[in-house]
Regions:
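Hydrophobic small-molecule pocket/channel-lining residues, especially in calycin-type beta-barrels
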Residues: 1-128
């Protein structure tokens, strides 16, 4: 789950299962790349890479690698994300984030995706 825990992404391992139309989540095709889970997402509706307004177009392709590792005796997962958008970016946008496995879900507090106009749902458009 992403976005504070109330959205679900579906990774397909078979390209034949991908939907044709663009969505906020896009169509994600997953495969194993050595020990990394590689996920390539296409067919997203235009949106923002970050909350502060870096836009991406419906032509953007997001490639992610999910890597599990042990550091300092604890389980971690690192997600490396590359956004390639020929319409809005002059170069690829690359970021990595690391997450530590917790013993339980006692600190997990899922929140809905909201904007200043209320809850966000599929099909919403935010124009300036």
């Amino acid at each position: 789950e992403t976005d504070h825990g109330q959205q679900t992404r579906l990774f397909h391992f078979n390209a034949a299962e991908l939907a044709g139309a663009g969505t906020l989540q896009g169509n994600s095709l997953a495969s194993w790349d050595d020990r990394s889970l590689k996920v390539v997402t296409r067919a997203m509706t235009a949106g923002y890479v970050r909350r502060n307004g870096i836009p991406y177009s419906d032509k953007a392709v997001v490639t992610e690698w999910f890597d599990q590792h042990v550091s300092f005796g604890e389980d971690w997962i690192t997600v490396t994300t590359v956004v390639d958008d020929p319409l809005n970016f002059t170069q690829k946008f690359v970021v990595s984030s690391s997450f530590k496995r917790l013993a339980d879900d006692s600190s997990w507090n899922p929140q809905p995706c909201v904007s200043e106009w209320g809850p966000v749902k599929e099909g919403d458009r935010f124009n300036d």
